[in-house]
Amino acid sequence: MGVHPIIRRRGRTAIAACCVALVALVSPAIAGTRTSSSYHLTTHLGLKKVRDSAGPQQIRILHLSPGKNVPDIAPATQQYPMWALTSSMSARAGAIAGINGDFGTSRGQPKHTLMIDGELWTTGQSGGDAVAWSANGKTAYIGHPSLKILAKDRDRTDAFFVQGWNRGAPNGGSIQGYTTRGGTVTQPPGKVNPQATDPHFCAARLTPTAPVGWNGKARTSIVRQYKVEAQPSPCPKTPLGFNGENDAVVVAAEAATPAAGKITGLRVGDKIRLSFTFKGWRNVTDVMGASEMLVKKGNNIAPGYNPGDNYILNYNPRTAVGITKGCSDVDTTTKCRLIFITIDGRQGSTGWSKGVRLPNLAKQLIRAGAYRAVNLDGGGSTSMWSKKRNPTFCESTPSVGGCLVQRPSQSNGERATRSAIVVMPSGDAGTPRGLR
């Protein structure tokens, strides 16, 4: 009897050892095998191609260390509505790589905040988060953009905030700003042929008198000087146009609101200073709006999916951008890297790539080194383009040249979007001199 426990113990030990061996053999198949290849597109830009058999998933990662190569934003067109392919926007900009940008509306507007080379295009149609960077790309931020637009009448020591920019008609007592970027979609309020029931709007047209620049060494606000060129009185029902001035700004408020007094208080010839301030984001010249935060201070904060949730939280192709801790800390010895990632999806049945939910996307970004990260447009919009062609990483070759390094989910290829984040080969020539 005394011997049997020892024998049984050995048996258990042997069985346990056998089980461990089996787990060691089986676990990779359960967890998925991950294979990767890395390529140098330039000295500062690398491409990593990853296949994870769990899913399966096809992942593409661009690592940018800003230096000679810098990030920039390429718009689909110069005015709304905006529609173009990521490959076309990237190639037209003279970029060496690019990914699709923010979500958009059915009317061809960016959905969230968009600033390009120091010019605010829109405050967006809804809230959201954003990625932002300096002209040289060595400072970057990700989070919720806290933007203040202040108009100061330097002749009358009066000031007012502008609540929206190329967003829509004034409502709720707000003052809205408009530029020619709004195109045929977002225009100054009013009706060309108004009816008796249409509201009156008070508006003023401002034209620039000086180049754009910073508010000083702190570089916390982008500023520009204007003069009041027109301020119709009494406030009409018809819109105030730009009078052929591409750089003109129209500010407007509904006549029946207290905000109208700020507009009617302006006089033709008054000197106005407009300032654009992203709180806590100094030195920023480019801002790309986005949706959900994925990574914050190195932690995965992506929203999960539960049955009945919006399909956007389920398995989908994905595009996202992340930054390292060195992009926005005060330690000058830490370096900034930007991380652009795409994960193909809706192609699981072919064995190519299933797509991921947002927590898995965040996991991949953290693995790639992201300290903060945010979700961009995905689904059929997900695209990553490279100017350099290499048969080992190219998946298709668009007519504009270069290649797509991933496979769009739509059978007809890329889907048109509103903008792209691109990597420029030698600085950002589009940034005005006063903001460099």
Give residue ranges: language-model regions.
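Secretory targeting and sorting signals
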Residues: 2-31
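Gly/Ser/Thr/Pro-rich low-complexity, intrinsically disordered segments
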Residues: 12, 30-436
